[in-house]
Amino acid sequence: MKQVVYIANSESKNIEVWNLCKSGKMNLIQKIETDGKIQPINIIQKRNLLYAGIFPDNKIITYSINHNGFLEKKNESNIPGKANYISFDKKKEFLFCSSYHSNFISVSPLNKFGIPQNPIQIIYNIEGCHAAKMNYKYNILFVISLKEDCIYLYYLTDFGILKSTEQNILHTQKKSGPRHIIFHPNQDFIYTINELNGTIDVWKIYKKNNVIKVKNIQNIHVLKNRFLKDYWCSDIHITSCGRFLYACDRFFNIISLFHINQNDNKLVFFKSYDTEEQPRSFNINSHNTHLIVAGEKSNTFIIYSISNSTGELKKINVYSTGQRPVWILIHALC
């Protein structure tokens, strides 16, 4: 299966498309201008569409992905503020846009061609709304408020309207600054990375008396035995096998590996690796064989191989990219 890598370079105002070989060797195959600074990108695989959040004009550009991974611009859709995170519902009928700077989450229907329409709902006053992601098993959108140290929970109705759950808010530690979120493949466990205090929270989601509950079961530092005053954590991802979790910090320029306990799904710190300067974004391929980290300040990205048995990372190569790479995705072509 052919793989391509998309890198969003904010200051260069472009998306680079790289071919990824099984060996880990990479080569640049396309560079497409975005008519503005770019931040989040995301893909709907079954539609072969890539969505990019652009500012300062505040819009989402939709690109088609051809059989070789090349991008072609299809449409522009206006949004009410700067996009920081893009995600979708399970059926890929709605697009959720988080805005850290404008403090909102918006819901935009996708038409039959996958093009975002005008938002049908905007929820304001979510301070520092850095990310929102749907738990497909429980039909709950987790909306992260970095500045409030909390996570809001919303059900998604059939018409795309969000409504608060019975337990409508999760509180993280004070001044922790929750930033990004991932789900275990079984969807029963949630992992959130806290930007400001250098920790990861582990949450369990379950039903009790036919009501969905979420409880915190662990808080663990991204650096073992280093409890410092300043952190600047950024991204978090889990392998599709559910055995390994990775998290990075931009202040220390590291990426840490955790093993996931197969009995309770809590995290066990394993190892940290020095990586590219200011690692804002990284991604894991669908076969769990490679991990790529983009250095926002170094304007480079590094590709590692992943050990199938331990999750350990082994450097393959470092490549130069555009100015200020802020988002990276690995896409398997159908």
Swiss-Prot record:
It catalyses: 6-phospho-D-glucono-1,5-lactone + H2O = 6-phospho-D-gluconate + H(+). Its EC number is 3.1.1.31. Pathway: Carbohydrate degradation; pentose phosphate pathway; D-ribulose 5-phosphate from D-glucose 6-phosphate (oxidative stage): step 2/3. One of its GO terms (biological process) is pentose-phosphate shunt, oxidative branch. InterPro entries: 6-phosphogluconolactonase_YbhE, Cycloisomerase_2, Lactonase_7-beta_prop, WD40/YVTN_repeat-like_dom_sf. One of its GO terms (molecular function) is 6-phosphogluconolactonase activity. One of its GO terms (cellular component) is cytosol. Keywords: Carbohydrate metabolism, Glucose metabolism, Hydrolase. It comes from the Bacteria. Transmembrane segments: none annotated. It holds the Pfam family Lactonase. Coiled coil: none annotated. SUPFAM superfamilies: Putative isomerase YbhE. Belongs to the cycloisomerase 2 family. Catalyzes the hydrolysis of 6-phosphogluconolactone to 6-phosphogluconate. This is 6-phosphogluconolactonase. It comes from Buchnera aphidicola subsp. Acyrthosiphon pisum (strain APS).
